[in-house]
Amino acid sequence: MTKPQQQSPPSTTATTTTSPPPPPPSTPPPASSSSSSLAKLPLRLHSLASSSRSLLSALRRSPVTTLVAAFFLLALFMYGEDVRTLAELSIDDYLYPDADFYNVSALPPLLLPPPTCDLSRGRWVFDNTSLPAYREKECTFLTKQVSCLANGRPDDLWQYWRWQPNNCSLPTFDARRFMEKMRGKRMMFVGDSLNRNQWESLVCLVQPILSKGRKKIVKRGSFNIFYAKEYRATLEFYWAPFLVESNSDNPNFHHIDQRIISPERIESHANNWKDVDYLIFNTYIWWMNNEDIKVRRPNSTSWSDHDEVPRIETYGRVFKTWSTWLEQNVDPARTSVFFMTISPLHNSPAQWGNPNGIKCVKETLPVLNYTKPLDLNHDMRMYDLVAKVAKNMKNVPVSLIDITRMSDYRKDAHTSLYSIRQGKLLTPEQKADPQKYADCIHWCLPGVPDVWNQILYTRILSKSSPPSPHPPLPPQ
């Protein structure tokens, strides 16, 4: 890791402005070709590579051989294969070895916090020695939406704050330890753009240890899939902002005036969640436009045929559908399920003692001098409902990762005016209207979602022992 440039700690005068106190082993990610065709792909690519070597030497001997060879190679490329799939999986994926197994047992023991330690309670500590975990310009997989420095943000202090739990320490994210745990497995973030924000963070945390040309992102429908080819592992994001079916399920075109959901219909999404080793869910921000939610009537043929139902009632129906699906379709011996709690909005500066501010604009420091939690007007009924559902799961444990309070204090870390709208950077005219255009929902990277992943990493490694030195490779 490149040693970060030393940053000066924030001055005490500044703080007074704050308020007091590879593809999976069994089934690859969905593709446009059939699963049987995909299963045969590695064998065909191996045959293609072997045949190519033989044919290349024959090309020099006869024009007829050359013509036959050309037709043969064309047939190998076209027969029974989807062009997109061939483009995504190159021949060298099957000619070069996997990453060497990382000898985790040779490392110092990983000091994990005790189960009794509440990782969600603590404080933010300025740390310009070990942070940031990566540099924005060094992670080429970052989207423009969260690349705040590249988008013109003039300060970078938000990157240098480490989360310190009150009664224990949080292990530093070790990408090699994590990827050994992920070898031959799938991890999938399911939800809205905040879960995508966290997925991007995780990709940036692991990508430095992966060889050039052996890592890539493929976007297909509702999926963004990061392939760590040396580990035959995938880190995936799946767009489902309400978890259940809605009229906002198109991952590219979902800016809809009237959001309508089907609380009892989940299969079109959930069928894509099967055979995944780690499932990380979220859903909150898309519920917050109105107190009542538009709900499609049962057996209706149009989204326009709907009723308005109180938000908390609809949320409860969705989580009944979601939890039932998990109980009936997830094998807890294979799959670990996590749920990320509320990620806050910072739209009301008076809530942190800055009544003259405009949303999160020009905030450069966390809330530091606090003695009690901030009140940011979260709908805590929704938080409590998810916690109750998780507690009452019978066969499939759901682990809540509480990111809410720690993130509440980070008014400084949002993308604010240094983001994009409809694929374009904000214009000077838009920046002049921060009340309308400042994004105080999403987070700059590197930043707060790195800590969320640090906690996820800790929870995953706390649940099991180190992997065997020589586990079998997943079938190709």
UniProtKB/Swiss-Prot annotation:
Tissue-specific expression: Highly expressed in leaves. Expressed in roots, stems and inflorescences.
Membrane topology, Lumenal segments: 81-476
Biased composition range(s): Low complexity: 8-18
Keyword terms: Disulfide bond, Glycoprotein, Golgi apparatus, Membrane, Signal-anchor, Transferase, Transmembrane, Transmembrane helix
Motif DXXH motif boundaries: 439-442
Protein name: Xylan O-acetyltransferase 4
This protein's record includes keyword Transferase: yes
Enzyme active site: 193, 439, 442
GO cellular component: Golgi apparatus; Golgi membrane
Chain segments annotated as transmembrane: 64-80
Species annotation: Oryza sativa subsp. japonica
Record motif GDS motif, residues: 191-193
Biased composition, class Pro residues, residue ranges: 19-31
Pfam families: PC-Esterase, PMR5N
